[in-house]
Amino acid sequence: MQPVVETLSGLERRVDLAVSVAEVEKEVQAQLKRVGRTAKVAGFRPGKAPLAMLERSHGPGIRYDVINSLVGRAFEQAVDGAKLRVAGSPTLTPKTEGVAEDTLAFTATFEVYPEVTVPDLSALAVTRYDTPVTDAEVNQTLDVLRKQRAKFEIREGRASQDGDRVVLDFAGTIDGVPFEGGKAEDFPFVLGQGRMLPEFEEAALGLKAGESKVFPLKFPDDYQGKEVAGKTAEFTITVKEVAEGVLPEVDAEFAKSLGQAEGDVEKLKADIRTNIEREVKARLQGRTKGSVMDALVEAGKFDVPKALVDSDVEGRIAAAREELKQRGVPNADSVPMPAEVFSTESERRVRLGLLVSELVKQAQLQAKPEQVRARIEEFAQNYEQPAQVVSYYLADRQRRAEIEAIVLEDNVVAHVLENAKVADEKVPFDQLMGMA
């Protein structure tokens, strides 16, 4: 008789399972005999130990495995018969009341996958982003590269300005008491690079070598130094040196320093434009994809299995702890990481994954081999030996599958854009590149 699966609430289901004690014991005895052929028991030759002795040493473990196997088989038969897709693993609870002596009974509580309905794509409002790359962006990037290669020349009597390198001594106190990290001598930094807190840089602006200043500085509440975060310190700084940054000319020597072997400035600019366009394209794709995925999630109204959300949360917590270890954070395994910090994003990821999977199936989308190859070749252009990178990905099925997943996601985005209400939006270059 097929077990009856009971609907509890939402995606939760329950089913009663039963296995025969006789069937359990029959399988236990069979496995004990198999183990007995090779088991080494003190005082007996291999294969000659009495079954009763094997029962004492191996019986409990074998019986546990057999019961798990038979109950698992009964569960699979029950959900297959009900044509259900189980999300996660069931929770098994032994039953004792009203159960025959020759039967082991359990209640399995579990979740099922939801019926996912892909929203009407024509009703979705999404944004497609664009950023033109002109000579202005190329020249702006050239200026950044020049500043990175600036040579600093000491200027006597110069009041410090943005872009200057200053060398100074500083000492800070909180309530009159020095604190760790609050004092340094001959400390160099470039004004305007954002290396120091804004109030600190502002205090150093306009000072000449030999001049000092006393000023208050409030540390941000989220400052990395927890012992001073949110507190106000009093700093004294004394400037010892002001050096002006002298930018290199954009000439053959400069081009060669950036890897343009021939020293051709125009070819350098062309290379810079190509690199900018590649980076801009990747960032625009990311923004547009974000708009598409946000629209899908917003329109996808269905319950998601808690088991899948919990699994995603566990994975993200494990990844976060691993990142802390890589950064050398002590006791990373004991750092508090409440599940609720991750649960909202995990639920979104699970919902989006179910939606995208159903959309791929309905629209019969796939990552075509030529698309995968093109994406690998495009990705390889970021490396000095692109041909080796292409071979690296094509030679390994798992690595190739990573690119296939990216291409398939791109095809999902393209499919939605073909069918949705699309608004085109220009993004300023500085904003796109995080320079604004």
Swiss-Prot record:
Keywords on record: Cell cycle, Cell division, Chaperone, Cytoplasm, Isomerase, Rotamase
Q: Which SUPFAM superfamilies match?
A: FKBP-like, Triger factor/SurA peptide-binding domain-like, Trigger factor ribosome-binding domain
The GO biological-process annotations, alphabetized, read as:
'de novo' cotranslational protein folding; cell division; chaperone-mediated protein folding; protein transport; protein unfolding
Q: Name one Pfam family in it.
A: FKBP_C
The record places domain PPIase FKBP-type at 163-248
List where in the cell it is found: Cytoplasm
Write out the catalysed reaction: [protein]-peptidylproline (omega=180) = [protein]-peptidylproline (omega=0)
Q: Which GO terms describe its molecular function?
A: peptidyl-prolyl cis-trans isomerase activity; protein folding chaperone; ribosome binding
Q: Is Cell division there in the keyword field?
A: yes
| One GO CC term on file | cytoplasm
Q: What is its EC number?
A: 5.2.1.8
Entry's free-text remark on domains = Consists of 3 domains; the N-terminus binds the ribosome, the middle domain has PPIase activity, while the C-terminus has intrinsic chaperone activity on its own.
The role this protein plays is: Involved in protein export. Acts as a chaperone by maintaining the newly synthesized protein in an open conformation. Functions as a peptidyl-prolyl cis-trans isomerase.
UniProt-recorded name of the protein: Trigger factor
